[in-house]
Amino acid sequence: TQESPDTAGVVYIVEDDEAVRDSLKWLLEASSYRVELFESGEMFLAKFDPNAIAVLVLDVRMPGMSGLEVQEHLIARKCDIPIIFISGHGDVSMAVSTLKKGAVDFIEKPFDQAALRSLIEKMLQEARQRKAKAEQRSLNDALLSKLTPREQHVLERIVSE
């Protein structure tokens, strides 16, 4: 079944190197992903949709705001977008720091294309599942709020048994 653009998800790529950005776009669009490119962390934070089903492929070292700073901004906004860091000059302590703060992976350039595609697909699938569960919780809450006090009492009795 073909997924709609809203449920298929988007891959955000934040990378200052145009050649790397373009090669990632080509690689992922060839696999039918919807891709949005940003050359800086500031541009990404100004334009991304925090409610989208998405994965963020984020360069660590960029002029202006670093990838680490972008991650901090997303944490402060309570945005749980999966982040895959990419870096040409990463070190172990940097990788550990990003992972402890919730990044999904830390990949060194040049990276294995098949492994990156597989990781992105896994993260988008998990994001779709999280969104579906959140929507179901909202629907359940809306239905529960419509119960009369008597119906709420009966439900509480049933659940407690």
Predicted segments with their positions:
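Helix-turn-helix DNA-binding segment
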Residues: 138-161
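Receiver (REC) domain active-site loop signature in two-component systems and cognate sites
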Residues: 60-62
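Acidic catalytic/metal-coordinating carboxylates
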Residues: 39-40, 66-69
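Active-site beta3 strand of CheY-like receiver
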Residues: 51-58
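Two-component/phosphorelay signaling modules centered on CheY-like receiver
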Residues: 9, 17-36
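C-terminal output helix
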Residues: 91-93, 107, 111-120
